[in-house]
A protein has these predicted regions:
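An active-site-proximal "capping" alpha-helix that borders the catalytic cofactor pocket
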Residues: 26, 185-192, 397-415
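Glycine-rich loop(s) and the adjacent beta-strand/alpha-helix scaffold that form part
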Residues: 166-212
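Short beta-strand to alpha-helix junction loop
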Residues: 80-88, 108-127, 176-181, 208-211, ...
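Residue-level recognition of phosphate/Mg2+-coordinating polar/acidic sites
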Residues: 32-33, 45, 66-68, 85, ...
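Glycine-rich FAD pyrophosphate-binding loop
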Residues: 31-55
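Short hydrophobic core segments
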Residues: 15-17, 40, 142, 161-177, ...
Length: 416
């Protein structure tokens, strides 16, 4: 995609800054109302993070029924729920059908396009937007506002300033900065007096501090299945079965991402967080003790754990990491550790490595149309807002829905 020629100093319609799902949905909504719209993006093409999300299969939304669906947004369930009232999972699936793309419900209720790919959907979407009259301006990095309130951009041709009838900011969070969502907008918006919660990693891994042996020999090894147990901010214990992966610095994977918000908040409050892993789901301590009490002869403890407790090498090395070389001397302790292996999580991985981010423009800084109370005519959408959700389609669903909300708000502003 090439830059549209020559940007006027004053746009007749609405400027959408950010070409991710939220920004593109806002642009579509605006154009459907007959209002001119220009989309600006810092990268050489739009939807780059959207394409990466589709690498392992594009999970566009989730089939979970509401209101349970809304609870996935934690303390922002009420506000995000209002967006979903206008564009829920069924609406998203019907929208995709408009491109000839059917969807299906896969494992654990996740919804995918039939071919599981992001590129066909993005290509069709951008084509339709262009045909409707949406103008794209690529490699235009937004820098904030000048003293006259005009939008400032760094462009291939140099600095540029322009005025628009309304502006929608859909600049993303702070994860995957190489794809455009680098969080650089925080400085400009803070200077403008916008209330912003610090950006933090979400759906992320955590550092543990392994021994050199584990870090060097078992990084990348999967742990499956396991049951993770952890405590929330109120001290309630929760359990979730799934899979995770050992890394050179700690642990990550789907079950860790799903509980990362609670773990991150505990670390913020207490300096670290305790995570317990059940390495042998389906077997109780008594049965494990009986199996491990059998004579093991000349077999190594690792081989014995594989035969008697069905622990692979990755799970066994975790047991040795916690109990040390004398792990087999106390069978009761060994069995208890297998069922509740303690890991002290030291810190979340950097936001640049996270799947998504928490924090951003506080929802209280917006009115019900997603317009900034402090800046009439400026709207916000997508991951740059202060909400978070687990993977599984919840992230994209809220981005689409918030883009629609901001688009409708900007249309109403222009038509007032």
């Amino acid at each position: 995609m090439n830059d549209a020629p020559g940007i006027a100093l004053s746009l007749p319609g609405i400027a959408v800054i950010g070409g991710g799902p939220a920004g593109l949905m806002a642009a579509e909504t605006i154009r459907a109302a007959g209002i001119e719209v220009d989309v600006f993006d810092a990268m050489g093409s739009v939807g780059r993070k959207f394409l990466i999300a589709g690498k392992g299969g594009l999970n566009v939304t989730h089939s979970e029924a509401r209101p349970a669906f809304d609870t996935r947004y934690r303390e922002r369930a009420r506000e995000v729920g209002a967006w979903l009232d206008e564009f829920d999972a069924d609406a998203l699936r019907e929208w995709a059908r408009g491109f000839g793309i059917e969807t299906y419900v896969g494992s654990a209720g996740r919804v995918f396009p039939m071919d599981r790919k992001a590129a066909p959907l993005l290509r069709g979407w951008v084509r339709r937007l262009r045909e409707s009259g949406v103008r794209f301006h690529l490699r235009h990095r937004w820098l904030g506002w000048d003293g006259d309130g005009r939008l400032r951009f760094d462009t291939p041709a140099g600095a540029s300033c322009l005025h628009a009838g309304a502006t929608i900011l859909a600049l993303g969070g702070g994860s995957w900065p190489q794809l455009g969502s680098d969080g650089a907008w925080v400085g400009a918006m803070s200077e403008a007096g916008i209330d912003i919660a610090p950006l933090r990693p979400s759906n992320c891994g955590f550092d543990v501090g392994w021994s050199a042996h584990l870090a060097q020999r078992f990084a990348g090894a999967p742990l499956k299945p396991v049951i993770a147990r952890w405590h929330d901010a109120e001290g309630r214990e929760h359990a979730l079965q799934g899979e995770c992966v050992l890394t050179e610095t700690g642990i990550e994977g789907s079950v860790i991402y799903a509980i990362s918000a609670d773990l991150r908040e505990t670390i913020t409050r207490d300096g670290s967080a305790m995570l317990h892993l059940d390495l042998a789901p389906g077997r109780d301590v008594t049965r494990l003790c009986e199996a491990l009490s059998m004579p093991r002869g000349k077999r190594s403890l690792g081989e014995w754990l594989r035969r008697q407790a069905a622990l692979d090498a990755a799970k066994a090395v975790l047991v040795f990491e916690v109990l040390g070389s004398d792990a087999g001397n106390d069978i009761d302790r060994l069995a208890s550790t297998i069922k509740r292996l303690p890991l002290r999580l030291l810190r979340p991985r950097p936001i640049s490595e996270a799947i998504s981010s928490a924090g951003g423009v506080r929802l209280g800084a917006l009115d019900d149309t997603s317009m900034l109370r402090a800046m009439p005519g400026v709207f916000c959408a997508g991951e740059m807002l202060d909400w978070e959700a687990p993977t599984g389609g919840y992230l994209l669903q809220a981005c689409f829905a918030s883009g629609l909300r901001a688009g409708l708000g900007a249309v109403a502003w222009m038509q007032r």
